[in-house]
Amino acid sequence: MTTKYITMNIKLSYHWAAAALLAIATGCSNDNITPETKPDSGKPETTQVSFIAGNEGTRTSLNYDKEDFYWEDGDRIFVEDDDHTFHASSNAVSGSKVSHFKFMMPGKYTANDYIVYYPGKNGTNNQVTISANQTQTEPDNTLHFGTSGDCGTGKATRQTNGQYTFKLNHSATYLCFKPTFDHPLASTYVTKIEVTADQPIAGSYTLGTDGKLTGTGSSTTITLNLKGTGSYAKGFPMQNDATAKKCAAGRMFMVMMPGKYKLTVKYYVTDTETQVSGVITKKFPAFEYGANDYYDIPSALNIKYYGDDYYTWDAKKDYWYGHKNDQPKEMGIPGSNYPTSADADRWFNPAKFPAKASHTAKDCPNVNEIMWYCKKGDPHWDDTTLWTVWQHLYTGGMWFKKASVIAKENGEANAAALKSKSPDGKDRTSKGEFETPPNNTSITQKVPDDRSKYFFLPAIGYYAAGKLTDFGGHGRYWTSTPYPYDKNISYNLYFHAHDVVVSNGSDRWNGYRLWTSE
């Protein structure tokens, strides 16, 4: 058996890892041999023939790191005897991680060799069921293989003492997932993994004498439920590493019918503190998944991370600079040491129109650009895409068309051309317009079909007098343009689920987000 590592950079490829699982004979050479199970003394040896699974063969569970395989509690084998009758072993494995076992077989056996069938714990004879609903109760554990569809065959050969020995070769495919994220997360769990193929990957199959599975199957989707007891009752936790800069869950394993498939993998995650759940989807092109092989599926969770810096308009430093411990991370909680006019670094820039921002907001879009985003950006409200700040999961935000897309669709030379004038032809950066805040209430309530043409802004709220406000439901993003008619106001992009506004009524001392044109 080998482990194959699958990587994806638009197109899927794989390579053999130098340290991958080698032939199991090598992986099992260091197994400790447990005492053989003896037949009942009251049963004649002529009716109970020994079929011994030696330490040189594969078993039915895996220690992934040590590359050791074991038989597990309740495992039985089946053999078709001289009378063409299938028999189950009269005994089953007792205990866990058993490396060597003597199965006692009723029936008539006079030939030199026989095919041994292991159809899994839910199978009989040579009939196998690869389950469409599999459950793993703790990370890095494969005890569920037997009930999920693990199966195999082996050639049992008669020895001089009349016993038969065999090596089990597995017939299913095994997928390995290890979800990771490049920032720390708290109270976040992976609750299930769902794999969907372009043809059936689970159902009822027949084990052939050649060890191959045949049959059409019945389900194109396999769900791996990740739930146990104790610390795993809510799912498998994303654990922060020693540096507290990233996190990972343990390995998760799925049994699948071998074949060539296009796979869609969905990771279901939940944050038990914020009560936010979501799905992260990855698609893989057609690939041949072989029998008796493990495949490491790329499992980096694509969750957008946002920092927690907010700013008064064009301040030199962020709103909570030097006072991060005072920054509220929940709404309604007042924070002390928020900016005042006495703090030159955190207080807003008093520049007057038509001057532009010269500090932290200098690279933000100007008022002309946000007019384009508002009126021509085809805004889409999205309450499903996950994003994270403060080690927790959240949803809520707006998609806008990229400036380059807007320019092309509206006959402008390029994205930079949007800086010089608004959609109505007026340049609001050089001449003031006293007007009701322009807005757009035509908001599509879903993720854009072609996200490559759009960019996303989270509804990450703002700070007013030290209080976090409208978090998760509203977004406020500064521009580089002061408002012409009030020295304490600057333009900003404001949105919620049903409206996008070119806001001209926001005080500069509020803590809003910075951003750049896409």
List where the protein language model places each region.
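Sec-type signal peptide cleavage vicinity
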Residues: T2-T384, Y394-W399
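C-terminal, surface-exposed recognition/capping segments
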Residues: W387, Y394-E518
